[in-house]
A protein has these predicted regions:
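Motif-centric detector for short Cys/His coordination patterns
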Residues: 1-80
Length: 80
């Protein structure tokens, strides 16, 4: 069984609310998070210091035990 291409293997954050992502298929992309900040679930990420704590866990980007984002969504909406 092959690993899905959209599994996140690494993330770096930027102060401009970008996620610089590496995926399991070797592609690297940039996901602009600014439009996501409008969504109620991501309101706490308006705190830049908290946004910058993003890390990879179980193949996707997470901030804490309650907040993550679907890796498929990141892959489909990243600029490559």
């Amino acid at each position: 069984m092959s690993i899905p291409k959209w599994i996140v293997t690494d993330v770096k954050t930027s102060k401009s609310y970008e996620l610089h992502l590496s995926f399991s298929n070797g592609k690297k992309g940039i996901f602009n998070f600014l439009s996501e900040l409008q969504k109620p679930i991501y309101q706490q990420l308006n705190d830049l210091d908290f946004f910058l704590t993003a890390h990879v866990e179980d193949g996707t980007v997470v901030w804490n035990d309650e907040l993550d984002i679907a890796p498929e969504y990141l892959y489909e909406n990243s600029a490559f």
